[in-house]
């Protein structure tokens, strides 16, 4: 029953997004369908030891954070990644899922070899304006700490 619900939900989302102006203008991208196994610090947090020196990593739909997990654990993996971050001076962060966007091709997708990125609004004390991070829950690549954040201890 749960599986049917997720399939119907995914169809609705994919149908709605495929007709958007942004999707029509940019077309479907691809991230190469990597499948790197992630390590857990604890049940709610990934181990993330690498710092990105690319200012676009996570901040653009062309260079999303790839946490993997798909329909079964993708949303949880997104939170596991975000739980591994702190502000640049050790501030705790807060995050809110804004929704999905930006269709792309992936062999790890649910239907028709496609997936959507999730957008999270992330904030911490001292940050002038909240930032939006783009996360891919279908493909899994080496996780990195985006510019402006630090590894949670």
Question: Which residues does each PLM region occupy?
Answer:
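C-terminal motif of bacterial Sec signal peptides marking the signal peptidase cleavage site
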Residues: 14-16
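Short, non-transmembrane alpha-helical segments in secretory-pathway proteins
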Residues: 64-101
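Short, compact, well-ordered microdomains
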Residues: 109-153
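A cross-family detector of function-defining hotspots
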Residues: 99-109
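Bacterial signal peptide processing site
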Residues: 18-21
């Amino acid at each position: 029953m749960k599986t049917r619900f997720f399939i119907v939900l995914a169809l609705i989302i994919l149908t709605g997004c495929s007709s958007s102006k942004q999707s029509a203008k940019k077309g479907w991208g691809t991230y190469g369908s990597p499948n790197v196994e992630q390590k857990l610090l604890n049940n709610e947090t990934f181990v993330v030891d690498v710092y990105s020196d690319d200012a676009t990593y996570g901040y653009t739909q062309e260079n999303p954070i790839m946490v993997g997990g798909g329909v079964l654990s993708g949303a949880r993996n997104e939170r596991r990644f975000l739980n591994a971050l702190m502000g640049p001076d050790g501030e705790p962060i807060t995050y809110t899922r804004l929704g999905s966007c930006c269709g792309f091709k992936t062999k790890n997708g649910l239907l028709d070899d496609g997936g959507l990125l999730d957008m999270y609004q992330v904030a911490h004390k001292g940050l002038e304006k909240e930032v939006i991070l783009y996360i891919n829950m279908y493909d899994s690549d080496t996780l990195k700490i985006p510019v402006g954040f630090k590894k949670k201890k």
